[in-house]
Amino acid sequence: MRTYWLFLLLGGVVSAESLLSPNKRSKEASMDEWTDQQKGIAMGHMLNNIGDSGMHAKDINPGCIIASPSTDSPDYYYQWVRDSALTIMTILDRFFEGDKGLEPIIVKYMDEMVRLQKVPNPSGDFYAGGLGEPKFNVDGTSYDGDWGRPQNDSPALRAIAFIKYMNYLFENGKEVHEVTVWIEAVLADLDYTANHWTEASFDLWEEIKDVHYFTLAVQKRAMQDGTAFAKRIGAPDQAALYQRTIEPIDLKLGEFWDPGMGVIKGYKGRVDRSGLDCSTLLASLYSNEFDMHILPTLLKLQETMTRDYPVNQGWKQAMGRYPEDVYDGVSKSIGNPWFICTSSAAEIIYKAIAYYDNKGLPELTEYNIHFFMKFAEFGDPYNWSVIRKNMHTYADNFLKAVAEFQHPNGSMSEQFSRDDGHQKGARDLTWSYSSLLNAIYRREAIKGSV
């Protein structure tokens, strides 16, 4: 399988030009063909950022997942707990689908995370505060510079990733006593989450210290997954703790719905921001539930960014983090579209299609009618087959933007210019590849369904 990834990195790439040219699309390359090729290309680029065998990750700790090989302007050559967990979850999904050659990477990642938990750092140590530390050096030592600390989504996401793999192990005959070190790590992260979820921490963009929608959403999932996990390993006290934490988190999440704007806000009480933020899309993707309010939120984001970004001409739907963004990838000037956000917008729609395929269309309300009417024909918002087809096209347009602005070899940085689409910021961002793969496989999962 790794040979296949390397082959795709060296050649055989469906070009964005052939994909996007209306006259060539049907003859030379379809979206299906491009996404099929990107499975190997994006996976290859992503694995290049994982130590100690990746092309960009030589001579670093085994299992260390670097955010990017960029060491200057900007310097992202660190391992973030969040980014690493999200990356390994993408790898776990491929492993569960049969790519067993990925298992050594998963094991090395988990062992590296166990080590990092015990490293004293500016946030504290294993017993007091240290699990909220957001990033570490690639040799596994503490990063002691100034940073946005703590980031309390990190231990929750790490616990979710660990539980995914350990549930697989238990289902395939592994005994609890064989993985006690990993169990200790999971319970530590879950206990931290249960005891600190009410506290302000920095958001996933590392800019605002507050209570955030994304952080709460992944903390809720950690408590849900953790409840079942604790019961499975025979830890009833922890199971009870996690169980009783779920409802208050859920109630807090409800406070982020703004009926006046008709959107879920990423944060509240900021006079300098509307609260419209791509982080809410990511929260929906990494949670266990599907909140129907996420669709009008996505539409509002897309319409705002289509208006604000000159690069969004015609069908293009490049997505950035939030309308007021000023981070240009290196310094502060003006924000740009991000590959993470653009791919995740597509994935949200594919997830919604799968949900409505199973559940049927919801009751129309003043909040969702605009979304469904956008995809209806002849004013009929109840014809699911028509709405589904048009939603799928809408989702594919996000991926077409990714195809146009990635490099010919499939490489993706963090951002691309809002003006001309040239890539900006940290090169070969691991999360960019992870988010694209997630969208592609979510798209594949709804093929053939009605």
From Swiss-Prot:
Identify the InterPro entries for this entry: 6-hairpin_glycosidase_sf, 6hp_glycosidase-like_sf, GH15-like, Glucoamylase
Q: Which reaction does it catalyse?
A: Hydrolysis of terminal (1->4)-linked alpha-D-glucose residues successively from non-reducing ends of the chains with release of beta-D-glucose
Catalytic residues of the enzyme: D203 (proton acceptor), E206 (proton donor)
Q: Which GO terms describe its molecular function?
A: glucan 1,4-alpha-glucosidase activity; hydrolase activity, hydrolyzing O-glycosyl compounds
What sections of the protein cross the membrane?
none
Which GO biological process annotations does it have?
glycogen catabolic process; meiotic cell cycle
Q: Where does substrate bind?
A: W147
Task: Enumerate the SUPFAM superfamilies for this protein.
Answer: Six-hairpin glycosidases
Q: Which residues are glycosylated?
A: N383, N409
Q: What UniProt keywords are attached to this protein's entry?
A: Carbohydrate metabolism, Glycoprotein, Glycosidase, Hydrolase, Meiosis, Polysaccharide degradation, Signal
Regarding protein family, the annotation reads:
Belongs to the glycosyl hydrolase 15 family.
| UniProt-recorded name of the protein | Probable glucoamylase
